[in-house]
């Protein structure tokens, strides 16, 4: 009788979701900033998980005694096969309970050293599974340890003496009851399947009568359907080390999940949000194997509590921004590293750097605050003015101009450098745009794919309005000679400080070089002057010598009268 109602509800939900999606997607806007090679997608609303709601789910089991019916009837054989599967499932759950208890205990000891998490302690029991399987359990629990801490706390209490009987008694006359556990916490418990009464009071009496013959095949089918849920739950817990996520429809059917949401102590708006997005709720929920005891299988379902809803959210997309010099290897690059989801939260901003951890449904963003950082609202200034003095924007630098594309909500950012060919195409018209070197943006209007080299990107087809904000690429403001490379976790101020240090070093080097050159110049001048003086003196001496020599050559010889008389007399005397 429930199936037609579920179909009607499903159709209504789908129509409402389609209408909501079409209406809300019109509010999405996107702004591309050419100066920083980044884009901001706006118009989203928040659904931030701030806590957990835990509930205990039970399945009543039958302690099947030896079935004495071994007839040859085909339907009886099918029943016996299902009973064997049932017994094997119960045995597997019992072994799994031991292994997960021990794994939880070991995870509690290892978490402080590996992840600084603390899990609630559980009673140590013997583990009959292989070491490889135990290591798999431990690794899984280490990965989700902090997320399931509250669920493990409830699961631990169920292992105390009398807790299972307390739940079993509360569910004798109803399928849902609030039970106060020994630790003082009240939890909602639900019985989703009663295999005990069905097997003991309906199935086995039919099988064991009339010479072990079953005339109605519906009996076989009914048991297979009921047993299948237990078998699937066992399989999921076994494969996933006792902790499963998302919560499957075997753990909780849609009607059971909606009923549980309706009983949660939250506002009507929160209930409506969760009821309209049950698939997202399932993805962010956990099922935790607890105990099988007193003919009861009990497991904990941990659902998210969305304490922050309907606040504005936006997503930042970034891509490398490089210079476009033709000389290979001479370019410098800068990339904003603050990409991710942002949501307003109580006067500040919750930042989710791993955008893939958030789930988007239409214009609704479901994120877990455990994965967030709290930032001041001034972080928004980085989008319009990356050099603003109120918030130090985060960047990384390099000297490798790699071409790539980033798909945004309403288009694509294309970083095209070197000899890479970058194009945008329409499936009917072919290439409609070829990108030149640099960072550019294309909206999804009339564009189906973006190609960068040999890589093909498919753009989103979400409706909305795109805005291209032009501006001088900030990378052009930097000198390649002093630009710091390979800064992977830096900020604008840190990069500028390193540039200033480099410039100061260059200035100091120039001053030292100037002083050295000045000293060398003075010495050279003195040496040159001395040489010139020596040369002048030598030239002067040579000039004086030549002058005296020439003067001596040009002066006539004169003799006195006595000398002439003597000469003449001597001459005449001969």
Curated annotation (Swiss-Prot):
Transmembrane region(s): 525-550
Disulfide bonds: 37-439, 69-212, 313-343, 322-333, 358-367, 382-393, 416-422
Glycosylated residues in this chain: 27, 70, 116, 120, 126, 500
Sequence segments annotated as region (Fusion peptide): 137-157
Presence of the UniProt keyword Membrane in the record: yes
Site (Cleavage): 109-110, 136-137
Key words of the record: Cleavage on pair of basic residues, Coiled coil, Disulfide bond, Fusion of virus membrane with host cell membrane, Fusion of virus membrane with host membrane, Glycoprotein, Host cell membrane, Host Golgi apparatus, Host membrane, Host-virus interaction, Lipoprotein, Membrane, Palmitate, Signal, Syncytium formation induced by viral infection, Transmembrane, Transmembrane helix, Viral attachment to host cell, Viral attachment to host entry receptor, Viral envelope protein, Viral penetration into host cytoplasm, Virion, Virus entry into host cell
Coiled-coil ranges per UniProt: 76-96, 158-209, 481-516
A GO CC term assigned to this protein in UniProt: host cell plasma membrane
Signal peptide: 1-25
GO biological process terms on file: entry receptor-mediated virion attachment to host cell; fusion of virus membrane with host plasma membrane; symbiont entry into host cell; symbiont-mediated induction of syncytium formation
Segments on the Extracellular face: 26-524
Residue positions bearing lipid (S-palmitoyl cysteine): 550
Cytoplasmic side: 551-574
Family affiliation: Belongs to the paramyxoviruses fusion glycoprotein family.
Protein name: Fusion glycoprotein F0
Name of the encoding gene: F
């Amino acid at each position: 009788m429930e199936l037609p109602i579920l179909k009607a509800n499903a159709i209504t939900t789908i129509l409402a979701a389609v209408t909501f999606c079409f209406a809300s997607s019109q509010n999405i806007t996107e702004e591309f900033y050419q100066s920083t090679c980044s884009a901001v997608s706006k118009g989203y609303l928040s659904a931030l998980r701030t806590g957990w709601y835990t509930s205990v789910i039970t399945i009543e089991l039958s302690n099947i005694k030896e079935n004495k019916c071994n007839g040859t009837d085909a339907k009886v054989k099918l029943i016996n096969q299902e009973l064997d599967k049932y017994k094997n499932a119960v045995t597997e759950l019992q072994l799994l309970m031991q292994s997960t208890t021990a794994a939880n205990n070991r995870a509690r000891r290892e978490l402080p050293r590996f992840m600084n998490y603390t899990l609630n302690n559980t009673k140590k029991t013997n583990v009959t599974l292989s070491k490889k399987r135990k290591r798999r359990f431990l690794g899984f629990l280490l990965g989700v340890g902090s997320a399931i801490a509250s669920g493990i706390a409830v699961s631990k209490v169920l292992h105390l003496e009398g807790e299972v009987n307390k739940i079993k008694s509360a569910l004798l006359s109803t399928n849902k009851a609030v039970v106060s556990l020994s630790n003082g916490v009240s939890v909602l418990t639900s019985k989703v399947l009663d295999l005990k009464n069905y097997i003991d009071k309906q199935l086995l009496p039919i099988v064991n009568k009339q010479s072990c013959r079953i005339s109605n095949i519906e009996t076989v089918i009914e048991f297979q359907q009921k047993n299948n849920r237990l078998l699937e739950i066992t399989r999921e817990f076994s494969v996933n080390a006792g902790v499963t996520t998302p919560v499957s429809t075997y753990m909780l059917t849609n009607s059971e999940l909606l009923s549980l949401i309706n009983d949660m102590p939250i506002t009507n708006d929160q209930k409506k949000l969760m009821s309209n997005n049950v698939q997202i709720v399932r993805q962010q929920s956990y099922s935790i194997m607890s105990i099988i005891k007193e003919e009861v299988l009990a497991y904990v379902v941990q659902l998210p509590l969305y304490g922050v809803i309907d606040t504005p959210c936006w997503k930042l997309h970034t891509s490398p921004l490089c210079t476009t010099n033709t000389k290979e290897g001479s370019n410098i690059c800068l990339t904003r590293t603050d990409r991710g989801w942002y949501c307003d939260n109580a006067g500040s901003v919750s930042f989710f750097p791993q955008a893939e951890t958030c789930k988007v449904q239409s214009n609704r963003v479901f994120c877990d605050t455990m994965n967030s950082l709290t930032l001041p609202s001034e972080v928004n200034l980085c989008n319009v003015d990356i050099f603003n003095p109120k918030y130090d924007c985060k960047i990384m630098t390099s000297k490798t101009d790699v071409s790539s594309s980033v798909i945004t909500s309403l288009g694509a950012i294309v970083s095209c450098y070197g000899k890479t060919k970058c194009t945008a195409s329409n499936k009917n018209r072919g290439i409609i745009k070829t990108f030149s070197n640099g960072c550019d943006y294309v909206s999804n209007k009339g564009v189906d794919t973006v190609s960068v080299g040999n890589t093909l990107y498919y753009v989103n087809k979400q409706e909305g309005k795109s805005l291209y904000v032009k501006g001088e690429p900030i990378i052009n403001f930097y000198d390649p000679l002093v630009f710091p490379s390979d800064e992977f976790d830096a900020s604008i101020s840190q990069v500028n400080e390193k540039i200033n240090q480099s410039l100061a070093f260059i200035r100091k080097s120039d001053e030292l070089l100037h002083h050295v050159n000045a000293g060398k110049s003075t010495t050279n001048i003195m040496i040159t002057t001395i040489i010139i003086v020596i040369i002048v003196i030598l030239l002067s001496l040579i000039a004086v010598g030549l002058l005296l020599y020439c003067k001596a050559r040009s002066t006539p010889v004169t003799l006195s009268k006595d000398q002439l008389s003597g000469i003449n007399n001597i001459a005449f005397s001969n």
